[in-house]
Regions:
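Membrane-embedded beta-barrel scaffold of Gram-negative outer-membrane proteins
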Residues: 296-298, 304-310, 314-322, 513, ...
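Face-selective signature of the C-terminal outer-membrane beta-barrel domain
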Residues: 291-313, 357-482
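Structural signature of Gram-negative outer-membrane beta-barrels, strongest in the C-terminal barrel
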Residues: 228, 368, 387-391, 395-399, ...
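Gram-negative outer-membrane beta-barrel transporters
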Residues: 573-575, 591-687, 721-724, 745-749
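Acidic/polar loop-and-plug regions of large Gram-negative outer-membrane beta-barrel proteins
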Residues: 207-211, 224-230, 234-298, 313-368, ...
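Conserved C-terminal beta-signal and adjacent last beta-strands/turns
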Residues: 366, 390, 552, 649-750
Length: 750
């Protein structure tokens, strides 16, 4: 892994060597840049220079934290049709195979999805559906504490999904992709100028496949519509509609196995990653519907107020089951022998086609409604002899979530047991009637929150800026838990809990920008997240204060003299210093845990020559440790610690090395070739002493343009060595990464 990181660093130093000497003019470049109708989109380059992840439109060089941008061009080059796959193209991202079947995203080893750190156009995006890239212009990954901008959140950072917006041009594109596993994907992107300052944009998608390369079928469709009026004028309005339907299969996971009899280590099963052992009746349905609007009022070229409102409806209906090696055991309560036909242990020495597997029952059925409002002001002015870039804003939100459970036969429902299967008979077509389940409300959660923030970037000297920001958040949550008697259909009893949290989130930093090509920063920020985000409220945690975290970073953003190549470097330390633990003596949650990570990151993105383009992202995380967890109980039996982590361990899902490299070369005006690597070092799921092996996968791309660039044919070969690796980890199982896939895309522009 280290040579790849060294290659990125060497490329960046080469670009730095091209940096021109400082100009005589001392004025720094404008921080807030207004969008122009002809501004390039993410599909035009791998390199991005601006972002709105800092609320106002800003140059990346003026944000005192690390930001990685995955543009639409990179998404298209590598045929990344899900947000999860796109995020794998940034260093430090890993995935937990969560109990609910969703992708629990980790950044620098800290959870993002569980703490609500995914956003669409700067507004929070609930974590109960599987996201697609068909309407994305780019993904922005802010690394480190993000609470100053977004409120409650994690230590690792935040991910902002930037939607495609209408432009003042008539331009359309239709793509058709065919691949192995009967993969078919069609997308359309239609931009229509409807007036001097108005435009309409429509995006649509449909995707089907028998297998996504890692055991799950695909059947999804989506549509998005955006209309803008007053583009570039004093008052600009936009209306957005978005809908996505997923009717996919689900590979809930495959168990690990001991390499030898009696070994405490675990390895991956030697199986084709596309192998499926779940029931044919398992499925993973989810949907998202968003309706929103925005108004931007420009007081001047350097001052604007942007107000957004959005309502959303989300649903998830997942019927699946964990696959386990069938093992003989004893029921601790009754003494009865379970699975008497199966061995008491498994290893690769005894593994074969007749090894028996059990299928579990895991339901995740929920719906969620959201309403959000936010208003953000950004402006430039001079005061006290200094230039200021000022940001301020307020936001309000309401979330309502209902989670359902199935009644057992003793409660007036049905008991469904899935048949076992054998290693040698995957895809056996086993079926159970999921429609016969009788559902009831299990819990309901309603939350209202509001926040306000201010930030000022003051230029205290020609090359120096200081950044100071502060945010206040108030969150109120009401949680109702419903239960039935163990052996009766009623009555339904309820317990109610209430949470109220008020927190301040500060951020401070210093920027040193001696030339337009160089920007160095030092920053410190604090974040928090509540019990209502990461856990369901209940008697054990209703009175638990928020977790708090701190991030310290020293970094640089460097551009080549021709501004075609950019490098980002950073060293950082992130600490969660009061992490939740379950008290070993009482059924309550306490803030007794602590963990920290420290490392180095480098991104190198842009054009090395007019024909050679590169995107690289690498993280080295040599320091990662669980410092403190729950104390031992009075019984003397020591707990396993915070969220299952054990003191002294390296936290789960924190590989020492991770990253990606992608490069393309324009050999002729019509022919472009590309190649890339994705890699992750060895890592562990929670509560285990063994590690999952590291992996490197390689991808190839070839693109040929016909008919004056109107028609393009592109072929992608991913995981060319058909590498077996664990993509998402859990203590009892893993979800394999996709095996070798071949996809061919025809694109027509008109």
């Amino acid at each position: 892994m280290l040579p790849l990181g060294a290659m990125l660093l060497a490329g960046s130093l080469n670009a730095m060597a091209q940096t021109a000497p400082a100009a005589a003019e001392k004025t720094l470049p404008t921080v807030v840049v207004r969008e122009q109708a002809e501004a390039p989109e993410g599909k035009d380059a791998l390199r991005a220079t601006e972002t709105r992840i800092g609320k106002g439109q800003q140059q990346l060089r003026d944000i005192p934290q690390s930001v990685t941008v995955v543009t639409e061009k990179l998404i298209d080059d590598r045929n990344l049709d899900t947000v999860k796959e796109a995020l794998k193209n940034t260093a430090g991202i890993t995935f937990l195979a969560a109990e609910g079947g969703e992708e629990d995203i980790r950044l620098r080893g800290f959870a993002l999805q569980a703490t609500g750190d995914l956003f669409i156009d700067g507004m929070r995006d609930p974590a109960i559906y599987d996201r697609d890239t068909f309407n994305l212009d780019r993904l922005e990954v802010l690394r480190g504490s993000a609470s100053m901008m977004f409120g409650r959140g994690s230590t690792g950072g935040a991910v902002n999904q930037v939607s495609k917006t209408p432009r003042l041009i008539d331009e359309h594109q239709v793509d058709l992709t065919l691949g192995n596993h009967k993969y078919v994907r069609a997308t359309g992107d239609f931009n229509i100028q409807t007036g001097e300052s108005a435009a309409l944009r429509i995006n649509a998608m449909t995707t089907k496949a028998d297998n996504n390369g890692s055991g799950a079928s695909l059947d999804k469709r989506g549509a998005a519509l955006a209309y803008r009026n007053g583009i570039g004028e004093r008052n600009e309005f936009q209306v957005n509609l978005y809908h996505l339907d997923n009717n996919n299969g689900i590979n809930y996971g495959i168990p690990y196995i001991a390499p030898t009899t009696g070994s405490s280590d675990r390895v991956l099963l030697p199986l084709d990653p596309e192998t499926y052992y779940g029931a044919a009746s398992d499925y993973n349905d989810s949907s998202a519907t968003l309706i929103g609007g925005s108004h931007t009022h420009r007081f001047s070229r350097d001052s604007e107020l942007k107000t957004q409102i959005r309502v959303g409806q989300f649903e998830r209906d997942q019927r699946s089951g964990a696959i386990r090696l069938c093992t003989r055991g004893v029921n601790q309560q009754t003494g009865a022998v379970t699975n008497p036909q199966c061995p008491s242990s498994h290893s690769l020495e005894t593994f074969g086609p007749n090894t028996q597997l059990t299928r579990g029952n895991h339901l995740k059925i929920q719906d969620m409604d959201t309403a959000q409002f936010q208003s953000d002001y950004s402006g430039k002015f001079e005061a006290l002899g200094m230039k200021h870039d000022f940001l301020a804003g307020v936001d309000f939100s309401r979330e309502e979530r209902t989670v359902y459970a199935a009644r057992s036969s003793a409660q007036g429902g049905v008991d469904i047991s899935k048949p076992t299967t054998l290693i040698g008979t995957p895809n056996d077509g086993a079926w159970v009637d999921e429609s016969s389940r009788v559902l009831r409300v299990n819990n309901q959660y309603t939350a209202q929150g509001w926040g306000a923030y201010v930030q000022d970037t003051a230029q205290i000297a020609p090359a120096w800026k200081v950044v100071a920001g502060l945010r206040y958040d108030n969150l109120t949550g009401d949680y109702d838990s419903f239960s039935l008697p163990q052996n009766a259909a009623g009555p339904l009893s309820a317990e109610s809990y209430r949470m109220e949290v008020s927190e301040w989130s500060p951020r401070a930093g210093v920027l040193f920008q001696p030339t337009p090509q160089q920007s160095y920063h030092f920053s410190i920020g604090q974040s928090f997240n509540t019990s209502g985000d990461a856990y369901s409220l209940g008697a054990s945690n209703v009175d638990t204060p928020p977790e708090k975290s701190r991030n310290i970073e020293l970094g640089a953003k460097l551009d080549s003299a021709d501004k075609r190549f950019s490098t980002r470097l950073a060293v950082f330390r992130s600490t969660k210093y009061n992490e939740r633990n379950t008290d070993p003596d009482r059924p309550v949650v306490t803030l007794s845990g602590e963990r920290h990570v420290a490392g180095f990151e480098v991104d190198a993105v842009g054009r090395l020559t007019s024909k050679w383009e590169v995107f690289g992202s690498y993280m080295w995380l040599p320091v990662a440790r669980v410092d403190r967890a729950a104390p031992c109980p009075s019984t003397g039996q020591c707990a396993q610690g915070a969220a299952g982590e054990r003191p002294g361990d390296r936290p789960s899902l924190t590989p020492e090395h991770s990253g990606t490299v992608w490069t393309t070369y324009q050999f002729t005006p019509r022919l472009r070739l590309g190649a890339g690597l994705n890699f992750r070092g060895k890592q562990s799921p929670t509560r285990v002493e063994w590690t999952v092996p590291s992996y490197v996968t390689a991808d190839l791309m070839a693109e040929y343009k016909f008919d004056f660039d109107r028609l393009t044919l592109k072929a992608n070969l991913s995981n060319i060595a058909d590498k077996l690796y664990a993509d998402q980890l859990y203590p009892g199982h893993y979800i394999p990464g996709a095996g070798r896939t071949l996809q061919v895309t025809a694109s027509l522009k008109f």
